[in-house]
C-alpha cells in the first residue's frame, strides 16, 4: 500500500505544504490503511479483487454493490509502481465495471483526485469507460 500510494501522498504534501498536510491530510492517509484492513473483515460491504502476475500481487481493486440504489462503487485500489503503465489499472476497472453490471448495477462510480499523483488512475478510469465527472475542489486555510 505504501509504495502504491506514495506518489499520491507526495503530491498532496507538495500542494498543501508541510503544515497543512501534517495536520489535515496525513491523518487521512494513515486512516486509509485502517480502511483497507477493515475491507477484509467478514462483515465488510466491500469485495476485494487482486491482480497477480507470476504469482505476485501487483494490484487490487475494491468494489461495493448497492442493490437498493443500483449504484456500484470502486473504492480503494492501486497498482504496484513497478507495474504501472502496463494497462493493469484499466484492466482492473473494466473487470470491476463488468462485475457491477453483472450484479445488476445501473451506474458505476469512483472518486479520485485531480492532483498529479492521481493522473495515472484518472487515465485508467477514462480508458475503462468512466467519462462523466463532477468537478470538485478541497480548500484549506491555515488558522
What are the language-model segments listed below?
Residues 125-135:
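Conserved acetyl-CoA-binding loop of GNAT-fold acetyltransferases
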Residues 100-114, 136:
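Conserved GNAT acetyl-CoA-binding A-motif
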Residues 79, 85-98, 123, 127:
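Conserved acetyl-CoA-binding loop-helix of GNAT-fold acetyltransferases
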Residues 2-75, 80, 99, 133:
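Acetyl-CoA-dependent GNAT
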Residues 3, 34-35, 91, 95, ...:
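Alpha-helical elements of Rossmann-like donor-binding domains used by nucleotide-donor carbohydrate transfer enzymes
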Residues 88, 105, 130:
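Short phosphate-binding/catalytic loops that engage adenosine nucleotides
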Residues 84, 109-121, 140-143:
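Conserved beta-strand-loop-alpha-helix junction that forms the acyl-donor binding cleft
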Amino acid at each position: 500500500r505504501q509504495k502504491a500510494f506514495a506518489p499520491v501522498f507526495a503530491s498532496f504534501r507538495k500542494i498543501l505544504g508541510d503544515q497543512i498536510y501534517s495536520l489535515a491530510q496525513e491523518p487521512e492517509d494513515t486512516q486509509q490503511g485502517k480502511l483497507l484492513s477493515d475491507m477484509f473483515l467478514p462483515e465488510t460491504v466491500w469485495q476485494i479483487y487482486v491482480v497477480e502476475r507470476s504469482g505476485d500481487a501487483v494490484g487490487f481493486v475494491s468494489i461495493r454493490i448497492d442493490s437498493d440504489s443500483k449504484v456500484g462503487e470502486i473504492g480503494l485500489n492501486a497498482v504496484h509502481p513497478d507495474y504501472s503503465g502496463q494497462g493493469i489499472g484499466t484492466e482492473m476497472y473494466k473487470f470491476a465495471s463488468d462485475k457491477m453490471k453483472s450484479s445488476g448495477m445501473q451506474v458505476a462510480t469512483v472518486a479520485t483526485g485531480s492532483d498529479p499523483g492521481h493522473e495515472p488512475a484518472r487515465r485508467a478510469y477514462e480508458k475503462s469507460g468512466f467519462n462523466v465527472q463532477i468537478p470538485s475542489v478541497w480548500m484549506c486555510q491555515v488558522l
